[in-house]
């Protein structure tokens, strides 16, 4: 029996328990392992046909298998959730978002529709600079309330973990405020957040023409304060022609690593700039965007532990060429896909749109895209040992679909087919009329 399809906009919790027995599953589909999957192996999912069951105890998966074989002692005190024949996949990991920001840039979107480029708008004082002004003027409460709207929508689409970056402050006070909002959000809603410091998103107006001085300001003043307050675990930078060069990137990321941060990089988005090679050399968790990655960059990532995080909704929004996902997978890269939610180049956190673009325009299979959005997304934030697959010992993060097979994620174009999102055993069911 098929579940009624949900409305994506309204989410209610139906079961709040860390001990949960999920029964009557039509099919379980998951990648397996504790690290990123490279190349064509991304398409090799572990499939369990139903009637299947999953047991979560104390928020951790304790059983995955046939419903008829569930040990009775495992489910004695469990809340029961009936999947009604729906497929179950791992909770989605959105490994690249700019979740916390002030203001909107709807007029810039109209300018791009009329032919203006993203970089021309940015160089004219729009783009990141306009969001920086609005974010600096926003209160903690305003930033938190705006982010909550996006998080509720993301939860309804199956996201259980997300990266959240700062980078719209670019001064000490506002960068700390953004990260404090992320910390508050972690305590006030279900999605687990991975906090990333991205003060090096651009050079702010007060450092205009002095980008190297700005990097030193981040290294000497901002990063140590972020570290001492425990507000972020990762450091990111926009390595791009006209933004930050390789020398500046090395300076910031090497300093961040010495302080105990993991590393990420926005790389090769606008022009081929050798960012992928540099990310692999520095041991970044991920190199993100990669619309203009070179052959050398593909080879470097394929021979490294750095995940290639692709952001198809951004290419779609910018009317840009998509990252060469098919070539990257065929040459052995570990690929993740993520939303890049932000107020400028991609005002969307739509999992259905992202999934369809990856399959239709980037040449990825339904299986590869599922791996990219789960286990490889988890690896891109350093959490593949804890989340990203449905295996005993991992966190109880699941998505119950309204259809009996995961392939409907790409087949039912543009539609949210998530019936329920399960986070650590707590069930959040989309509102159904």
Task: Cite the ranges covered by each PLM segment.
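Conserved beta-strand scaffold positions in the cores of enzyme catalytic domains, especially
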Residues: 21, 78-82, 195, 421
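Metal-associated gating/positioning segment near the N- to mid-region
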Residues: 78-146
């Amino acid at each position: 029996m098929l579940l009624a399809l949900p409305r994506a906009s309204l989410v209610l919790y139906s079961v709040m328990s860390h001990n949960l027995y999920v029964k009557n599953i039509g099919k379980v589909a998951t990648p397996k392992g504790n690290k990123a999957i490279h190349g064509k192996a991304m398409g090799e999912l572990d499939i369990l046909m139903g009637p299947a069951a999953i047991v979560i105890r104390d928020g951790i998966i304790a059983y995955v298998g046939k419903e008829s074989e569930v040990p009775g002692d495992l489910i004695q005190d469990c809340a029961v959730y009936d999947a009604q024949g729906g497929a179950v996949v791992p909770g989605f990991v959105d490994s690249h978002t700019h979740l916390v920001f002030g203001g909107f840039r709807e007029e810039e979107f109209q300018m791009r529709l009329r032919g203006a480029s993203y970089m021309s708008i940015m160089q004219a004082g729009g783009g990141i600079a306009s969001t920086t002004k609005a974010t600096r003027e926003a209160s903690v409460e305003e930033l938190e309330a705006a982010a909550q709207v996006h998080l509720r929508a993301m939860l309804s689409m199956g996201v259980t973990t997300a990266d959240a970056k700062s980078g719209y402050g670019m001064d000490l006070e506002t960068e700390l405020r953004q990260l404090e909002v992320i910390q508050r959000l972690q305590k006030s809603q279900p999605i687990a957040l991975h906090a990333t410091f991205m003060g090096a998103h651009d050079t702010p107006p007060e450092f205009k023409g002095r980008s190297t001085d700005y990097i030193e300001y981040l290294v000497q003043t901002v990063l140590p304060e972020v570290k001492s307050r425990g507000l972020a675990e990762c450091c990111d930078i926009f390595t791009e022609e006209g933004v930050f060069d390789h020398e500046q990137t090395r300076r910031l990321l090497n300093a961040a690593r010495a302080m105990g941060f993991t590393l990420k990089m926005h790389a090769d988005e606008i022009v081929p700039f050798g960012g992928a090679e540099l990310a692999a050399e520095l041991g970044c968790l991920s190199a993100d965007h990669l619309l203009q990655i070179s052959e050398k960059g593909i080879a470097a990532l394929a021979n490294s532990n750095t995940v290639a995080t692709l952001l198809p909704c951004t290419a779609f929004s910018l009317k840009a060429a998509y990252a060469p996902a098919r070539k990257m997978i065929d040459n052995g890269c570990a690929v993740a896909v993520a939303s890049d939610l932000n107020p400028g180049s991609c005002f969307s956190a739509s999992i259905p749109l992202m999934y369809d673009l990856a399959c239709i325009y980037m040449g990825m299979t339904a299986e590869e895209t599922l791996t990219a959005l789960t286990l490889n997304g988890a690896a891109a934030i350093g959490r593949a040992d804890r989340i990203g697959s449905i295996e005993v010992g991992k966190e109880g993060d699941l998505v119950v679909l309204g259809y009996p097979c995961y392939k409907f994620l790409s087949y039912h174009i543009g539609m949210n087919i998530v019936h329920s999102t399960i986070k650590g055993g707590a069930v959040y069911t989309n509102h159904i009329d």
